[in-house]
Amino acid sequence: MSKDKSWLDFDHLAEDDLREALKPPSMYKVILMNDDYTPMEFVIDVLQKFFSYDVERATQLMLTVHYQGKAICGVFTAEVAETKVALVNKYARENDHPLLCTLEKA
């Protein structure tokens, strides 16, 4: 194996380019929206299954969704947030519930 470490040389990068290369990824909030039809127990199940909340925290978030109209389930990188939104929405449809999960930039 070659001991050439020229690929580690960042001197050729401008300071702005280096800063851009090291910039942390954009983060996105995953949000559950309230509706008048999805059972509270199903919302708790979703929060436990897809966001790994214990029953107490899942219940608190479900009540936030119910009384305030929405709740932030977590903040993730774009790919993780998009995946969670897609999985939650698919799971809700498979179980004949109109529960809506969305994302927005944090």
From Swiss-Prot:
<protein>
    <recommendedName>
        <fullName>ATP-dependent Clp protease adapter protein ClpS</fullName>
    </recommendedName>
</protein>
<comment type="similarity">
    <text>Belongs to the ClpS family.</text>
</comment>
<dbReference type="GO" id="GO:0006508">
    <property type="term" value="P:proteolysis"/>
</dbReference>
<dbReference type="InterPro" id="IPR022935">
    <property type="entry name" value="ClpS"/>
</dbReference>
<dbReference type="InterPro" id="IPR003769">
    <property type="entry name" value="ClpS_core"/>
</dbReference>
<dbReference type="GO" id="GO:0030163">
    <property type="term" value="P:protein catabolic process"/>
</dbReference>
<comment type="function">
    <text>Involved in the modulation of the specificity of the ClpAP-mediated ATP-dependent protein degradation.</text>
</comment>
<comment type="subunit">
    <text>Binds to the N-terminal domain of the chaperone ClpA.</text>
</comment>
<dbReference type="Pfam" id="PF02617">
    <property type="entry name" value="ClpS"/>
</dbReference>
<dbReference type="InterPro" id="IPR014719">
    <property type="entry name" value="Ribosomal_bL12_C/ClpS-like"/>
</dbReference>
